[in-house]
């Protein structure tokens, strides 16, 4: 009794099948598990830097229509929903401009009263503790300016670093606002250089959340182009690769 050898398919059939499965697996991975994002601005300095690349867990808060590519399955709300925690670094779609992704820190939960006085965040009338850890000169584009780094401690005990150029800039004093049900309030860690819920972004609906930022998988300082291979070892921030995002 002889075994017949399975006939191999021609390459022009095998190749499209391989591409189809590869694309399908990538879509499932990005839609339901982890999606990569890059950091284009300094609004989350010192936590995240321009040139950082990170993975966002899509399953952390459940799924909405924005979890899928191009919103191909339109539905409202979230399925398998899980409540985010104060202090999470979150990627979300900007309200009113849902084609734009933002990444900020969640500071206000539904029902919270949020305000900023003299640069200090207040939650439900209580000032959030912050302690200065360092200061130095930073490049903010056209000028070099003195900045202070603080460690901020939320009521739940979670800590993170923030950067302040001054305590009297345009968004360092805001009127108290109450976060509506089904919405969240976000701020950038670079408090004087962030478009967030204090202005422009406003309250973010729960269905606009994409996921929680987890860890960096790559980082570079932008000082080497794709073709300047000899500069890559000096442009890559090896100390940031694999760093978790707190």
Where are these regions (language model features)?
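Soluble "head" domains of membrane/secretory-pathway proteins
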Residues: 2-13, 28, 32-33, 37, ...
């Amino acid at each position: 009794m002889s075994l017949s050898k399975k006939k191999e398919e021609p390459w022009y059939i095998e190749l499209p099948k391989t591409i189809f499965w590869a694309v399908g697996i990538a879509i499932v991975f990005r839609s339901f598990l982890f999606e990569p994002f890059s950091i284009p601005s300094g609004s989350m300095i010192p936590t995240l830097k321009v040139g950082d690349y990170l993975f966002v867990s899509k399953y952390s808060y459940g799924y909405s229509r924005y979890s899928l590519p191009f919103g191909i399955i339109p539905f409202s709300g979230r399925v398998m929903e899980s409540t985010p925690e104060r202090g999470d670094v979150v990627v979300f779609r900007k309200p009113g401009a849902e084609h734009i992704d933002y990444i900020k820190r969640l500071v206000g939960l539904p029902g919270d009263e949020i305000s900023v006085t003299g640069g200090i965040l207040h939650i439900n009338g209580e000032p959030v503790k912050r302690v200065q850890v360092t200061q130095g000169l930073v490049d903010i584009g056209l000028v070099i300016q003195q900045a202070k780094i603080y460690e901020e401690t939320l009521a739940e005990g979670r800590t993170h670093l923030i950067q302040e150029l001054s305590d009297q800039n345009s968004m360092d004093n805001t009127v108290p606002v109450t976060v509506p049900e089904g919405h969240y309030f976000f701020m950038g860690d670079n408090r004087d250089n962030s478009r967030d819920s204090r202005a422009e972004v406003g309250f973010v609906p729960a269905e606009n959340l994409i996921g929680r930022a987890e860890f960096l998988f790559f980082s570079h300082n932008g000082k080497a182009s794709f073709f300047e291979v000899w500069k890559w070892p000096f442009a890559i921030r090896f100390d940031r690769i694999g760093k978790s995002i707190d």
